[in-house]
Amino acid sequence: MTGHCLCGAITYRVDVEPMITANCHCRDCQRQTGTAFSVLVAVPRASLHIDGDIATHTTVGTDTHLNVRRQFCSNCGSPIVSLPDMTPDLAFIKAGTLDDTTMLVPEMDVWCDSAMTWVAMDDEARGQWARGVPLEF
């Protein structure tokens, strides 16, 4: 998989297939993306190779109270990846930055307790976690 930011200053590649794709409804993802949820693609951190001047903003997760490093393009501000301390071996790529999204189908919704009330979730199609993320996929 490959991807890039809006201006093209950041490019990345991943050497493996995604482990899982999820819609994250936590308040921090809502604030970072400026929308109802973030579509995240989980990959092993060691498989993610980023080129360009990536900036990092570290916050304490509102729900987890653990650090989350959010990396973004220092030029255009596009969010690229989240690196939560809660899952130290995983990187969560922002799906909108992928060059090819045709293979993506979200398999779960996480932090559903924080979902905006108007977001429709299909109980039958995906797993749902009210609070948190399953640590084993």
Show which residues each predicted segment covers:
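A short Gly-Trp-Pro
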Residues: 1-137
